[in-house]
Amino acid sequence: MRIAFISPFFPLEGGIARFSGLLAAALREQRRDDVVPLAFRALFPPFIAKGAEAPLPDEFRLVLFNPFSWLETIQRLRSLKPDIVLVAFWTGFLAPLFYVVRRFTGIRMVVLLHNLSSHESFFIEPLLQRLLAASADGVLTLSSSVSQEVKAAMPAIPLLQLFHPVYEPEGSLPSVVDARHELHLDSSAPVLLFFGYVRSYKGLETMLRAMPAILLREPLLRLVVAGHFYEDVSFYRRLVDHLGLGGNVDLYPGYVSTERSALYFAAADAAVLPYRSATQSGVVQLAYGHGRPVIVTPVGALPEMVRPGETGWVAGDASPEGLADAVGEFLDSRERLASMRPAIEAFRRDYSWEAFAVSAGKFLETIAAGR
């Protein structure tokens, strides 16, 4: 089956690009599908986009804010004659593009839905969701919370709920001792990692406000924050100073390479996701891929990805107090973290890219056939 896949791909930054690249590879390997990436060159104008630009291959032609590139993509699809178009969707601003592609090619389309509702909603979102519904012949979701939204918003569209596969580490991992030495962390202190893009809904502020209560319990605990800040990092630096956390919080703003991410996870005892809202998060899967448990808030699909006491801990709520209590549970369990590894390994096997590709491929075949 020939699949045209519209999405960001590496070397663009972000979890969507990484997810789509791994899915394309798994579809080729497990099913021998001919997956043709139709890759974005840019998603936002330079004055909005933040972060360093990586050189992109010439075939990365699609520009979300340039309708002329949409027309070129339509022409490419007409030449490719794929059996199905698979599109990655995580923000409403993609809906007009996908609507135009579906209408002017006539090729059936499956939406790989990371999020239906944006984390930071805006007034035209209902209109954009209607455009998406008019474009989709089928929908793939990664969590039950998103599936429920889809069933309510577009009940007539075929839906397959799958899962977010685990990200396996690339290359060898540094030892805990070496990683902590390089990051200037105490070899025996508890270390938590907040990893990935820093945006308001991800709750770093909440985690920082939980830290004073946590430090009353364990004064040596360190919080490592690594990722690209979509907000002013100086706000967080001032908050760290205001709360007296300078000796317990390390901020590493900016793009994190694969090698550097392995260093952070190797140094950490657990990853913390203090999200205020969420659907699912690739950070959980990345932590499991590195053999680390997680501490999450009870929002969106995050609790679905945690087996309490076996692969991590779920806070009672998304408040500083709730997070402090969950970290307390982690501290109580720290001596037996090694015993959690078999459960994390089992999760990795169950949530593999191979299993995802087999199920997704069968669904794509069904939609392509009009069934």
Please report, for each region that a protein language model flagged, where it lies by residue.
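N-terminal strand-loop element at the rim of the active site
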Residues: 7-13, 17-79, 146-147, 151, ...
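Donor nucleotide-sugar binding/catalytic pocket of nucleotide-sugar-dependent glycosyltransferases
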Residues: 134-173
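A short helix/loop element that forms part of the nucleotide-sugar donor recognition site in Leloir-type
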Residues: 171-185, 359
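Conserved donor-binding/catalytic core segment of Leloir-type glycosyltransferases
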Residues: 186-202, 208-211, 224
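A short, well-ordered alpha-helix in the C-terminal region of glycosyltransferases
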Residues: 190, 336-350
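Nucleotide-activated donor-binding/catalytic signature segment of Leloir-type glycosyltransferases, i.e.
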Residues: 234-262
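Acidic donor-binding loop of glycosyltransferase active sites
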Residues: 263-279, 292
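Conserved acidic donor-binding segment of nucleotide-sugar-dependent glycosyltransferases
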Residues: 308-309, 313-320, 328-335
